[in-house]
Amino acid sequence: LWKSEEEWYRGSFALSSLLPPWAEERKSFFVAWGNHHLKEAVSPMKKTSAKIPFVLLFSVGAVLFSAHAGGGFATGNQAHTYYVGLGWLGPVSAVGAMLLLTLTMREAMLMVNSRGLTSYKELFKTLYHPFDKLWVLFEIFFYIMVLMAVAAAISGAASALTEYFGLNYYVGIGLVGLVVLCLTIFGADLVRMASTYMGIAILVTAVAIYGVGIAWRGNLQEVLWQDFATQGFGNVPQAILNCFTYAGFQCVTLPTMIACGTPLTTKKACSRSMWISFVMNAVALVLSIFMLLSWQGFYTSVDGGTVIPTLTVCREMGMGWLTVVYGVCLLLCLLSTGVTTTFGFVARFEKLPLFRKISYAPARSAVVAAFIIVLSMTISLAGLSNIIKYGYGYCGYFAIAVVIVPFLTVGVYKNRKYLRAHPQAEGRSYEEAVKACQAAEPEEDTLPVPAGNFEKEGC
């Protein structure tokens, strides 16, 4: 079982601009399912004849999709910052990023489920073994990235207020920060209940805008061909870097995914679920890039048009009702992101000795929330584009070194080695493993008998 409620906060409050809170209800199902599974077995990956239903594979994959396609994605700023400037290579780089992300999540879930690990701390200790203390590198990345996400949510909401009502951006930051603080203290439960519908609405409206925008402009093929004719393969190095960087900062959702992925009790199930997620994520991201490429000449020429390019394009198409629906949903979604993420921060940090001197719990929570929001507001002064370009970007560089590369090299090796030594952890019986091995290598009579209890080993 997961060790404590605190561990769940640390895994779940990553539902930032990268994760709309409407995934919370689905995640709760996985938590209950996975914990029940762990109670009945020595390890989640044990001998089993039950076929994992497709709906479960799809649902776990959809959690990663919802983590990616949140309010930050819906603004269009992330796609503009990392892919539109690459021209025809933008969609290629985006597909590569989603492949890296899903492969990393697959290895992480496989490592957790095969060994019965109970936290991302144990996961990274296993990954980095014998250098166990390096697990703190992910902790550093995680908290910095989530703080950036809160700042991006405040900045995005303030930018939306500026676009719709002409409100001064800095006044908007103060107003949004105050609203987030009040909701965190008094209305977090209400926000969590409403966020399900807000998240669904923003995703549907954003995809609708992307589809209509591509058809409305009608010049996508011409834009791609023109860019290829002028740039050729000159942007390949930058495309590769952006591919890894984007996948890197999206790894902030890893704690949520290993929690939701506990029902995936075989290696094949982990793989299938992540391939489903890869298709969903790649299609959505490429669709947004295609739309922005089609309209790049327009929204880059508008003052402030690159901050929320999706809104800029929507206005130009003259679809007033869609513009209003999109704006309301985006604003509420970003606010809920700020509230739920701040609430998770409060639950984690109010236990520190620094704040224990405040005996009255509500006052202690309010002080911690105020500190976090003031810090996030300070960061948001840099503007949404700078937060995504530099804040997310440097976190992405860091994650390449501490998450992506380790999981896709050492992680792959350790998982394969562990599954060879513990065939039951792959969802096969020992007898089935022996037969498979004998069929592949007839000269060998048997396999080493695996331990009856799947101990948490370093490799």
Predicted ranges, named:
Residues 28, 41-75, 236-243, 262-268, ...:
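Membrane-interface "cap" regions at the ends of multi-pass membrane proteins
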Residues 152-161, 168-175, 183-214, 388-407:
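Membrane-interface loop-to-helix entry segments
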Residues 292-320:
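Membrane-interface interhelical connector segments
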